[in-house]
Amino acid sequence: FSLYVTDVEPAFTLGEMAKMKNDSILKLKSEKVFDLNKQKKLPLLPKRIAVISVETSRGYQDFIITINNYHKKFALELSLFEATLQGDNAITTIVRALQKIASRIDDFDVVTIIRGGAGDTGLACYDEYALAKEVACFPIPIVTGIGHATNETVTEMVAFKNCITPTAAADFFLEKFYAQDILINQLSEKLINSVSQSLND
């Protein structure tokens, strides 16, 4: 007797994944932790960034290239905490990285979870309650940039800020510094003009 599989019906698996995602959302909301990370205060200039990623990943490289364009000017401090970002080991390693960061929480202003180059595959771990709760309850803001553009995962929903790509996450941080840089230049110009006018009067 031989069995040949000619087709696979993904509806059951997709249905299970959708149920898991919905269950995670409902549980986090019932525990009143769903919006906790969004309520954290991001420093005006978040220069000390803990990065959860893989050093050799395309997403991390995109993030670093963008940051490095202004790294010296804005004196950003990046600390990499490596983790598996998809698949069976993702939850365990990301949670472990978060715990390491938490043990040094005074050293950081913000955390960013960076993943890119793999499309929408392997994202189920980000809908898991265990990971989403760690992010929701983390003591400082978490910014996600896990590199996909379709359905938002639960982890992205509960994070302080969800950026579609690692590059967008880098831009999010840099924009904070751009804004202050412009403001300082404007104030400096006003001060110079004011002093010049006073000397001429």
Per-range role (PLM):
Residues A50-D201:
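Short glycine/threonine-rich loop/turn motifs
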Residues F1-F81:
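Short, glycine/charged-enriched hinge/interface segments at domain edges or termini
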